[in-house]
């Protein structure tokens, strides 16, 4: 349940959640496994997995949702080889070249034949809906997968007035200033990893890992015009992460000490522990996002 990445959206119109109403809306779009002829299926599943019973898990005004995706694994090379064999056989038999339309029809026929025998894989993606700060946090490093979940949520509830989070000042400008000065805002501590890019196509990219970022070797790249597009940071004593210039927060890792705060609950009641961990995680993520927004100079005015 502990989030590992954050793609952040903000509401550009006031948004509130009624848990019972949202639960009913999601029920119409619940996940069901692929049938023999389905290439993929995507739908909402239990927010707390096998330990929960509902599609939304709520604590205060924080709401967790989860979606499951099943995809058939049908390698393109397998289809290509089967198609080439079929086309070759028919062209030899009929002594003519098949048209593109005929080849496309054969490809569809081959795909339909192979689908029932294809293996499938499942993945899950979670999101935290936070009306108290008017944001949604998606646990994904992929913008495309995050958008897919938001599209499903929008379809379920009818409207979802969100935009990707953006800031008044370009993030790379702030990150570059922090690295250049060797100083971050009080809530954060710089770690030993960064990626710098040049504005020009010829300037290239340089990455540093497990290195003192205050060294002249690093700062020299800023002097020649490169800007910091990724920077590893630590938030207080709780979360390590990498902040990117596209506002994505990746490789989110909660410290063992922080995660141990609920150890006194034990594991006799898994749902009680999950509920406590959810409250702990969501509170700290809200604190992290608020601190990031403050450190970067505030959000860009919504349109």
Curated annotation (Swiss-Prot):
It is found in: Cytoplasm, Nucleoid. The keyword Metal-binding does not apply. The keyword Cytoplasm applies. Keywords: Cytoplasm, DNA recombination. GO terms for cellular component: bacterial nucleoid; cytoplasm. GO terms for molecular function: double-stranded DNA binding. InterPro entries: RdgC (IPR007476). GO terms for biological process: DNA recombination; regulation of DNA recombination. It comes from the Bacteria. It holds the Pfam family RdgC. HAMAP family: RdgC. NCBIfam families: PRK00321.1-3, PRK00321.1-5. May be involved in recombination. Belongs to the RdgC family. This is Recombination-associated protein RdgC. It comes from Shewanella halifaxensis (strain HAW-EB4).
């Amino acid at each position: 349940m502990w989030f590992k990445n954050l793609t952040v959206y903000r509401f550009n119109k006031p948004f509130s959640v009624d848990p019972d109403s949202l639960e009913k809306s999601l029920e119409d779009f619940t996940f069901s496994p692929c049938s023999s002829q389905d290439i993929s299926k995507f739908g909402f599943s239990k927010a707390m997995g096998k330990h929960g019973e509902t599609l939304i898990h709520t604590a205060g005004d924080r709401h967790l949702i989860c979606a499951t995706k099943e995809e058939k694994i049908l390698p393109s090379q397998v289809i290509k080889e089967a198609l080439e064999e079929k086309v070759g056989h028919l062209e030899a038999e009929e002594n003519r070249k098949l048209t593109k339309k005929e080849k496309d029809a054969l490809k569809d026929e081959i795909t339909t034949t192979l689908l029932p025998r294809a293996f499938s894989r499942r993945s899950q993606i979670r999101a935290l809906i936070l009306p108290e700060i008017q944001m949604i946090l998606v646990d994904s490093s992929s913008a495309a997968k995050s958008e897919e979940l938001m599209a499903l949520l929008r379809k379920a509830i009818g409207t979802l007035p969100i935009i990707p989070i953006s800031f008044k000042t370009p993030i790379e400008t702030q990150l570059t200033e922090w690295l250049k000065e060797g100083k971050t805002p009080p809530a954060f501590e710089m770690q030993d990893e960064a990626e710098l890019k040049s504005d020009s196509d010829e300037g290239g990219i340089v990455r540093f890992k497990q290195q003192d970022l205050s060294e002249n070797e690093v700062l020299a790249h800023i002097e020649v015009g490169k800007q910091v597009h990724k920077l590893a940071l630590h938030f207080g004593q709780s979360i390590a992460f990498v902040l990117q210039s596209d506002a994505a927060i990746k490789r989110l890792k909660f410290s063992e000490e922080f995660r141990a705060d609920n150890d006194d609950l034990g594991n006799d009641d898994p749902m009680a522990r999950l509920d406590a961990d959810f409250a702990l995680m969501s509170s700290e993520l809200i604190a992290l996002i608020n601190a990031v927004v403050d450190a970067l100079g505030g959000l860009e005015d919504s349109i």
